[in-house]
Amino acid sequence: MSALRQKLDALIEQTDLQVNERQREQLLGYVELLNKWNKAYNLTSVRDPQDMLVKHILDSIVVAPHLDGERFIDVGTGPGLPGIPLAIMHPEKTFFLLDSLGKRIRFIKQVLHELKIENVTTVQSRVEEFQPEEKFDGVLSRAFASMTDMVEWCHHLPKTGQGVFLALKGLHPKDEIDQLPEWCSVTEIISLTVPELEGDRHLVILSRKDN
């Protein structure tokens, strides 16, 4: 067993997540591809695959138990975070991964092909210009600088009625919450525990007040 696999198993052991053998292999395969492509494409500032397991894989999959619904979009996905790890954790759900940069979308397509991930659709577009045929149960992001930007640029993406925004944040974002537009309200703030990651992590669930 590789050192990377041992590390992944040890990290998962510190959570309540159920991760089967195929999922573990896909998560490792993703880290290996990210590490390989990163040298040429500069996809992430995290250079060490062991650190990627903590800062990218675990930091994404701890959100998996909180995804209600079937159809999700990860906006500003970058190299596929948190979308690819979440798609691996939820093969029964559908994920759209959106980014405006072609090199990131090319990388994601290669990951989907090599790891045989079949529940992901890639979208190369600016988020405010993307008009989906069908709206989403959840709009995910860990890339946006502020939640106000996120909800204003993505306001057209959640389903009317039950669609939500899911913002992955560090510290409890009280200031950002205070600045949210009138039409948006906080449904829930979930404190996340990521093994071996320093600092706080929170998942903020937002919805339209007229839902």
Swiss-Prot record:
<dbReference type="GO" id="GO:0005829">
    <property type="term" value="C:cytosol"/>
</dbReference>
<keyword id="KW-0698">rRNA processing</keyword>
<feature type="binding site">
    <location>
        <begin position="127"/>
        <end position="128"/>
    </location>
    <ligand>
        <name>S-adenosyl-L-methionine</name>
    </ligand>
</feature>
<comment type="similarity">
    <text>Belongs to the methyltransferase superfamily. RNA methyltransferase RsmG family.</text>
</comment>
<dbReference type="InterPro" id="IPR003682">
    <property type="entry name" value="rRNA_ssu_MeTfrase_G"/>
</dbReference>
<dbReference type="GO" id="GO:0070043">
    <property type="term" value="F:rRNA (guanine-N7-)-methyltransferase activity"/>
</dbReference>
<dbReference type="Pfam" id="PF02527">
    <property type="entry name" value="GidB"/>
</dbReference>
<keyword id="KW-0489">Methyltransferase</keyword>
<feature type="binding site">
    <location>
        <position position="142"/>
    </location>
    <ligand>
        <name>S-adenosyl-L-methionine</name>
    </ligand>
</feature>
<feature type="binding site">
    <location>
        <position position="81"/>
    </location>
    <ligand>
        <name>S-adenosyl-L-methionine</name>
    </ligand>
</feature>
<keyword id="KW-0963">Cytoplasm</keyword>
<protein>
    <recommendedName>
        <fullName>Ribosomal RNA small subunit methyltransferase G</fullName>
        <ecNumber>2.1.1.170</ecNumber>
    </recommendedName>
</protein>
<keyword id="KW-0808">Transferase</keyword>
<feature type="binding site">
    <location>
        <position position="76"/>
    </location>
    <ligand>
        <name>S-adenosyl-L-methionine</name>
    </ligand>
</feature>
<keyword id="KW-0949">S-adenosyl-L-methionine</keyword>
<comment type="function">
    <text>Specifically methylates the N7 position of guanine in position 527 of 16S rRNA.</text>
</comment>
<dbReference type="InterPro" id="IPR029063">
    <property type="entry name" value="SAM-dependent_MTases_sf"/>
</dbReference>
